[in-house]
Amino acid sequence: MKLYDSYSNQLVEINDELISIYNCGPTVYNHIHIGNARPLITMDVLYRFLKKHNIKTKYVLNITDIDDKIINYALANNLKELEVSEYYFNEYLKIKKALNTLEMINPKVSTHMDKIIDYIQKLIDKQAGYFIGDDVYFDTKKALNYGQLSKRDLENDIVGMRIESAANKHNPNDFILWKKTNKGIMWNTPWGIGRPGWHSECSCLINTYIGEQVSIHGGGIDLKFPHHENENAQNQVLYNKNLAKVWMHFGLVNINNEKMSKSLNNFILVKDLLAEYDYQVVRWFFYQADYKQPIKFSHEIMKQNEKEILKIKNAIYNAKNYLYFNNQLKSLTQIDHFELFDERINDDLDFVGIVDLIHISVKKINILIKENKDMNELKLNLTQLLYMLDILGINFVDLHNDENLALLNTWKNYVDKKDYVKADELRKQLINIGIL
C-alpha cells in the first residue's frame, strides 16, 4: 500500500508488520459537523481494507475532552467541564455508529494526565522545555527541520499564526506545553497548577498507545500547522525521528466556496444531515473527490448522491431477485479480494477510480439481468460489488429472508399464472418492503 505523505510530498509504501493508525479526533464541546466527518470516514475505509486482508492494525482516535472551549461553555452554563465533554463524547459515539464506522481505541485526554505530565517532563529534561514564570514552553529551535511538515517559512509565515503570544519566548514560534491557570479544571505538577497545551496531548497519546512512531497519522489539512508540526517537533526531540511514517491530510469541506467551520458559523452538523439522508449517502458523498483535495457540499450534490445510492441498492436487490428466481441465490458466496479495486485502494485510496469501478459494476449487473446472460458472470459481478461496498462501509439491509422470499415466490407464481390482480396487490407489498 502506498499513501501520500505530506512531510516528504511523496507516495510512501506502508508494509509494517503491525500498521498503526492515529487520527486526530474531536474536541467534544459541540456536535461534529460534516467537515469533522471526512477524516473519520476516510480513515475508516483504510482500516476496513486492512482488516479485510487480515493485516494487523491498531487504530487510535483521540478525544480532546480538556480544552478552553469546553471550559468556557461549562462556566457559561454552570456545568462541570467533564459533564459537557462526556455528553458530547456520547453524542459522538452515536454519530460514529450511525455512520457505520468500525470501533477503534478512543483515549480521552482527561484520563491520561499523569502520562502527559511525564511526557512534558521528558521534554524539559531534554532542555526542549523552558519556563516563563509558571508556564512551560517548547523551544522549536531544538527540533530538527521545524516547519518541514507544513512547508512554511519560519521567519515570514509562521510568526503570528495561531501561536501563543508571550513575552520572553526564546523564539516567536515556540508553543506552550503547560500553562498555569486558576480557571476551570486543573492538575497539580512539579511546575504548579494548570493544564497541558493541545499539542502535547496528541503526541503523548501516540507515544502511550503506539510508541515512538506511528505508521499513519491522519487529520484535517487545517491541523497541519501548528498542531501536527508541533506534535512532530516534540517527537523529534525525544526520539530523533518523525512522529509518523506517513502524514495523511484530508481536504476541507467547502460550502458556498468557503471552508466549513464552526468559527465561520457556516457548518452543517452530521446529526442534522443524517436526519435528512441515509448514512450510505453521506459516506458516498466523501468518495466523490480525492481525499486530499477540498470537496464542495450542497444539497443539490447530496440529492445526486442519493440517486446514485438508490441505483446501487436497486441493482443489488434486482440481482438477488433474479438469482433467486433461477435457484442461484443460495450459491452466492463472498470474495476476499478484487484485484481492480484493491489496486485502487493501495494507490493512495483512489476514491475517484473506485467510484468509477462501482458505476461500471452496477451497469454490468443491470445488463446481465436484462439480457439474461451467464448466471456465473452475474454472481461474480454482484460479489465484487458487495465486496467494494463493504470496504467503503456501505451496506444495505438484507431483505432476502425466508419470509420475503416466500412472498417473492408467490408474486412470481401469480405473474406466471397471469393472475395480474393478485400479482399487483402483492407487488405493492413487496415495493413497500423494498425488495422490488
UniProtKB/Swiss-Prot annotation:
Binds 1 zinc ion per subunit. GO terms for biological process: cysteinyl-tRNA aminoacylation. A motif ('KMSKS' region) lies at residues 259-263. Its main location: cytoplasm. InterPro entries: Cys-tRNA-ligase, Cys-tRNA/MSH_ligase, Rossmann-like_a/b/a_fold, tRNA-synt_1_cat_dom, tRNAsynth_Ia_anticodon-bd. CDD domains: CysRS_core. A motif ('HIGH' region) lies at residues 26-36. Keywords: Aminoacyl-tRNA synthetase, ATP-binding, Cytoplasm, Ligase, Metal-binding, Nucleotide-binding, Protein biosynthesis, Zinc. It catalyses: tRNA(Cys) + L-cysteine + ATP = L-cysteinyl-tRNA(Cys) + AMP + diphosphate. ATP binds at K262. It comes from the Bacteria. Pfam families: tRNA-synt_1e (PF01406). Zn(2+) binds at C24, C202, H227, E231. GO terms for cellular component: cytosol. One of its GO terms (molecular function) is cysteine-tRNA ligase activity. Transmembrane segments: none annotated. NCBIfam families: cysS. PANTHER family: CYSTEINE--TRNA LIGASE, CYTOPLASMIC (PTHR10890:SF3), CYSTEINYL-TRNA SYNTHETASE (PTHR10890). This is Cysteine--tRNA ligase. It comes from Ureaplasma parvum serovar 3 (strain ATCC 700970).
